[in-house]
């Protein structure tokens, strides 16, 4: 039992090293490519794509994730599946924690959004939404929500990571965020998701459950 705990601890530390290394590499790289990505988005605008991306951005916010998580948690609880009830609850908590973390950082940094005409990109503490670009709250919340599912069950959750990726792209397409805003948000989301996934218990037998685990 001790060896198993030590193995899980070591594996957990390795994941934190990976997340930290990704942040060190990806955030500076994305800052470098911000201007290029902004120019690409401007060049590839179309009315149809913009309408679609606006819809994705609108329905990809945290309230929609919370409603989905609550519905799934209630279904799992009703079906008697303790493991999935806990997973869906962890997804909800991760979504909330990532959203709060992103909010604190964006208010503290005061980064201007791409559609704001200003020479100063970073302006210090600001409450105005026009200067709350870094990081993307939509992306952080969605990534935390679905990455928690992926950490809990990669076979089920891996494909759903396409959802936060689409939401992140939509936020850039509608000129709400820079590339580095969504990259930083995704890293926050993954970190929060892993933090929550570490606190989930192992598989639980549910003899009366109608859901396979």
Task: Identify the function of each model-found stretch.
Residues 68-79, 142-150:
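Hydrophobic, aromatic-rich transmembrane alpha-helices
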Residues 2-70, 106-128:
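N-terminal transmembrane-helix/juxtamembrane module of multi-pass inner/ER membrane proteins
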Residues 3-17, 118-213:
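Membrane-embedded catalytic cores of phosphoryl/pyrophosphoryl-handling enzymes
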Residues 26, 90-94, 98, 102, ...:
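Alpha-helical transmembrane segments in multi-pass membrane proteins
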């Amino acid at each position: 039992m001790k060896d198993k705990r030590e193995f899980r601890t070591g594996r957990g530390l390795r994941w934190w090293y990976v997340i930290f290394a990704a942040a060190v590499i990806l955030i500076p790289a994305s800052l470098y490519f911000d201007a290029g990505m902004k120019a690409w988005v401007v060049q590839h605008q179309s009315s149809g794509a913009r309408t679609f991306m606006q819809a994705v951005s609108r329905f990809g916010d945290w309230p929609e994730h919370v409603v989905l998580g609550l519905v799934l948690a209630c279904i799992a609880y009703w079906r008697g599946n303790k493991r999935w009830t806990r997973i869906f609850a962890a997804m909800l908590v991760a979504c909330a924690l990532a959203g709060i973390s992103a909010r604190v950082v964006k208010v503290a940094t005061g980064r201007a959004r791409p559609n704001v005409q200003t020479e100063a990109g970073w302006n210090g503490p600001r409450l105005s939404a026009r200067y709350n670009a870094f990081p993307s709250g939509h992306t952080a919340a969605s990534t935390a929500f679905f990455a928690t599912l992926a950490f809990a069950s990669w076979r089920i959750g891996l494909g759903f990571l396409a959802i936060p990726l689409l939401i992140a792209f939509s936020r850039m397409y509608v000129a709400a965020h820079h590339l580095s805003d969504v990259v930083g948000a995704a890293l926050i989301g993954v970190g929060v998701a892993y933090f929550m996934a570490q606190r989930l218990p192992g598989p639980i037998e549910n003899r009366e459950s109608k859901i396979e685990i």
